[in-house]
């Protein structure tokens, strides 16, 4: 999503509407915020008006000391800029001059009971998630031992069946068939399911299953960071498959690299157990231990002797 209507922000963060913008609504396009203390003192160089504006206790204390005519002039100048909204924290009093200026320029004036720091943190996290670059891919996403495992492969390769077996073994489904991937930071991806198919899984020969109803709320989750990608493919006798794990492979989504494993599929292989072990091995690597490297060191040491 590249922009958020202020109405959505009001609903999701439970904000009180003091003045509603009716004909001059401006969407939010950045997760950055601005505290306009300098603007109410008359300084407008480098004013980031495109951001959500937030006034807390410090700014309110300064504003309370301004004469009525001075505040009216400064509020009029402030709301003349195309700001998405002004939010007052701590349920603080809002002077009439600010309300009048917001009404005159048809800008949103909002209020929250939360303290400034707590609210700003919540707001930035919310905006980062909503405004994150996003793509949708075909696959399954499962929480395996706290590792977000994205299963990829051709249709019919067994992604959904593997996910179902993992759920039966106590792991949690995030998404089946369609995975929405969001870039939540420079090096992190988060996956989720489209709302309409959330918690559902399709198994050929059976149909649609409601995992939340069948296995309980502990078998699903709404979103998960993507830590590991497992590509399932038909076993190819002529293709070389890594048997040691000394070399790392990666795949890119939204310019973020994610570790990738390619698992060949053939009758008799228990894919769910392989995925479990892959997730545990990935966690072990995150903790600084690589079994393949340790074995390689031992072999080199033995050869050296």
Curated annotation (Swiss-Prot):
Record flagged with keyword Signal: no
EC number, as in UniProt: 2.7.11.-, 2.7.4.-
Chain residues that bind Mg(2+): 160, 202
CDD domains: HprK_C
UniProt KW keywords: ATP-binding, Carbohydrate metabolism, Kinase, Magnesium, Metal-binding, Multifunctional enzyme, Nucleotide-binding, Serine/threonine-protein kinase, Transferase
Reaction catalysed by this enzyme: [HPr protein]-L-serine + ATP = [HPr protein]-O-phospho-L-serine + ADP + H(+); [HPr protein]-O-phospho-L-serine + phosphate + H(+) = [HPr protein]-L-serine + diphosphate
Region (Important for the catalytic mechanism of both phosphorylation and dephosphorylation): 201-210
Signal sequence annotation: none
Enzyme class: transferase
UniProt GO molecular function: ATP binding; magnesium ion binding; phosphorelay sensor kinase activity; protein serine/threonine kinase activity; protein serine/threonine/tyrosine kinase activity
InterPro entries named in the record: HPr(Ser)_kin/Pase, Hpr_kin/Pase_C, Hpr_kin/Pase_Hpr_N, P-loop_NTPase, Ser_kin/Pase_Hpr-like_N_sf
Positions of the UniProt region annotated as Important for the catalytic mechanism of dephosphorylation: 264-269
Binding site for ATP: 153-160
Cofactors (names): Mg(2+)
Active site: 138, 159, 177 (proton acceptor), 243
Stated role: Catalyzes the ATP- as well as the pyrophosphate-dependent phosphorylation of a specific serine residue in HPr, a phosphocarrier protein of the phosphoenolpyruvate-dependent sugar phosphotransferase system (PTS). HprK/P also catalyzes the pyrophosphate-producing, inorganic phosphate-dependent dephosphorylation (phosphorolysis) of seryl-phosphorylated HPr (P-Ser-HPr).
Domain notes for this protein: The Walker A ATP-binding motif also binds Pi and PPi.
Family per record: Belongs to the HPrK/P family.
NCBIfam families to which the protein is assigned, alphabetical: hpr-ser
Quaternary state and interactors: Homohexamer.
HAMAP family membership: HPr_kinase
Note: Both phosphorylation and phosphorolysis are carried out by the same active site and suggest a common mechanism for both reactions.
PANTHER family documented for this protein: HPR KINASE_PHOSPHORYLASE, PROTEIN YJDM-RELATED
Identification of the protein by name: HPr kinase/phosphorylase
Origin species: Thermoanaerobacter pseudethanolicus (strain ATCC 33223 / 39E) (Clostridium thermohydrosulfuricum)
């Amino acid at each position: 999503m590249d922009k958020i209507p202020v109405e959505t922000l009001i609903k999701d963060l439970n904000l009180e509407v003091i003045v509603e913008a009716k004909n001059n609504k401006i969407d939010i396009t950045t997760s950055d915020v601005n505290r306009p203390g300098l603007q109410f003192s008359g300084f407008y160089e480098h004013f980031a008006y495109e951001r959500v504006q937030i006034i807390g206790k410090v700014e309110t204390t300064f504003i309370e000391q301004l004469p009525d005519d001075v505040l009216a002039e400064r509020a009029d100048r402030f709301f003349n800029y195309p700001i998405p909204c002004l939010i007052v924290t701590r349920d603080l009093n809002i002077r009439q001059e600010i309300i009048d200026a917001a009404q005159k320029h048809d800008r949103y004036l909002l209020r929250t009971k939360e303290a400034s720091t707590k609210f700003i943190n919540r707001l930035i996290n919310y905006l980062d998630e909503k405004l994150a670059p996003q793509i949708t891919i075909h696959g399954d996403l499962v929480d395996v031992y706290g590792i977000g495992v994205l299963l990829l492969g051709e249709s019919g390769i067994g992604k959904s069946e593997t996910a179902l077996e993992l759920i039966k073994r106590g792991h949690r489904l995030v998404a089946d068939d369609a995975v929405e991937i969001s870039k939540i930071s420079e090096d992190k991806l988060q996956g989720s399911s489209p709302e309409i198919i959330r918690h559902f899984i399709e198994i050929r020969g059976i149909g649609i299953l409601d995992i939340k109803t069948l296995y309980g709320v502990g078998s699903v989750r709404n979103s998960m960071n993507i830590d590991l990608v497992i590509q399932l493919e038909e076993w190819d006798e002529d293709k070389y498959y890594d048997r040691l794990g000394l070399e790392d492979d990666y795949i890119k989504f939204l310019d973020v690299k994610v570790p990738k494993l390619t698992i060949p599929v053939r009758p008799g292989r228990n894919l769910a157990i392989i995925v479990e072990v892959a997730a545990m091995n990935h966690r072990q690597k995150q903790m600084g231990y690589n079994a393949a490297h340790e074995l390689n060191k031992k072999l080199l040491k033995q050869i050296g002797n």
